[in-house]
């Protein structure tokens, strides 16, 4: 098993992508409570993310990237999760990497890659992918937004909901229906924000990840050149599968880093906080919660590491992806609640940031496919 990052003190950004965010901790963690309360995207902190080089990790050098592997990208995001207490900002960074850049590099034309990837890699062009619809949340294969061929263009009509980064995005990757019902009637298009017919709604107020904006996006007679299609017509399911595997691996590597930091903080508190003349960590009830947190962290690490290796080497990882997403998201919520309990009244206060962890964690059991959908998928793949 890969040792916990805390046991690798000599790691540097040059030797381990995990360390990319660490030099910027002070700037990333400034006034986190205030940004969360205002539910605003922290633009100055985004510039810090840009300077860190984290956004460049998985992209080819000819587009300004670092030519890192899938594992490198997971490590970079794990390190960001450990370093940055603004989980919403981290989530937007993960979305920036996977939403448009990853599928564009894998499936896009050279013309589109040369034109758009450099800005994506630097973070100057913020990206979002539009999959979820108001009437089709977890049922992504029944997308109803349509794209109709009209000469050299497609005309897109419909709408999407809960689109991360949409209020600030410059580029959108749209998953739409160009053919018959089912997975093989889907296609994917790259669309710029200022294209006539594309409307971005107001940011939606939400429980957690409050600095990561999301909104509705609607399309009315949105005319997109056929040259902006990513991959072949009807290849949308293939692209979606490629993206969703990486979305889960990347965003929950971020979560793993958050869990590592939470464990370290809880352990420090349990050793220093005294009640009845003893550190509270000596009480079995507290000690067992912390032991369970350590088990949860290492279980999450094992699932992410093994599943990432399968995806990176092209092995079938359908069950592994669903299990990883379920295990890590639910462990994150459980350990966040345990941290509140260990901190007691202090954990209930916004100033400590512990309650914010709970609000941020809950979303992980919903986005990228709910825990219930993941269990359904596992059962189906087992032949049930």
Where on the chain are the PLM-derived regions?
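Alpha-helical interface subdomain recognition
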Residues: 1-84, 107-112, 119, 123, ...
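N-terminal glycine-rich flavin-associated loop
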Residues: 88-111, 137
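A short, Trp-centered hydrophobic/proline-enriched beta-strand micro-motif
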Residues: 123-131
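Short Gly/Pro-enriched turn/cap motifs at secondary-structure boundaries
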Residues: 135-138, 162-165, 178-180, 206-213
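Flexible, small-/acidic-enriched active-site or ligand-binding loops
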Residues: 142, 194-225
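A structural signal for short hydrophobic beta-strand segments in well-ordered beta-sheet cores
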Residues: 145-148
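A short core secondary-structure module
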Residues: 157-200
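A short, charged helix-loop
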Residues: 215-242
């Amino acid at each position: 098993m890969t040792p916990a990052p805390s046991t690798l003190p000599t790691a540097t950004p040059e030797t381990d992508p995990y360390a990319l965010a660490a030099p910027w901790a002070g700037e990333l963690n400034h006034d986190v409570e205030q940004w969360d309360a205002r539910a605003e995207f922290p633009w100055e902190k985004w510039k810090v993310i840009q300077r860190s080089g984290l956004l460049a990790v998985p992209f080819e050098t000819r587009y300004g990237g670092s030519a890192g592997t899938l594992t490198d990208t997971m490590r970079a995001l794990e390190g960001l999760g450990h370093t940055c207490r603004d989980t919403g900002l981290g989530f937007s960074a993960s979305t920036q990497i996977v939403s448009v850049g990853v599928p564009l590099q894998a499936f896009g034309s050279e013309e589109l890659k040369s034109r758009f990837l450099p800005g994506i890699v630097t973070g100057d062009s913020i990206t979002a992918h539009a999959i979820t619809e108001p009437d089709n949340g977890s049922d992504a294969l029944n997308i109803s937004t349509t794209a109709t061929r009209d000469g050299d263009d497609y005309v897109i009509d419909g709408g999407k909901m809960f689109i991360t980064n949409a209020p600030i995005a410059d580029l959108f990757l749209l998953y739409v229906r160009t053919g018959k019902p089912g997975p093989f009637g889907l296609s994917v298009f790259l669309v710029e924000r200022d294209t006539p017919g594309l409307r971005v709604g107001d940011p939606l107020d939400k429980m957690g990840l409050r600095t990561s904006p999301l909104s509705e996006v609607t399309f009315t007679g949105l005319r997109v050149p056929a040259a902006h299609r990513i991959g072949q017509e009807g290849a949308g399911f293939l692209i979606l599968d490629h993206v969703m595997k990486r979305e889960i691996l990347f965003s929950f590597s971020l979560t793993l880093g958050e869990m590592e930091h939470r464990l370290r903080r809880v352990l420090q508190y349990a050793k220093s906080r005294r009640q009845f003349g003893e550190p509270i960590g000596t009480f079995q009830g507290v000690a067992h919660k912390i032991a369970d947190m350590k088990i949860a962290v290492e279980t999450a690490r094992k699932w992410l590491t093994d599943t990432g290796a399968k995806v990176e080497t092209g092995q079938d990882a359908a069950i592994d992806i669903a299990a990883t997403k379920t295990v890590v998201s639910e462990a994150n919520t459980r350990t966040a609640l345990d941290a509140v309990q260990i901190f007691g009244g202090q954990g209930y206060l916004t100033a400590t940031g512990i309650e914010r962890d709970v609000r941020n964690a809950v979303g992980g059991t919903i986005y990228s496919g709910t825990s219930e959908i993941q269990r359904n998928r596992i059962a189906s793949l087992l032949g049930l």
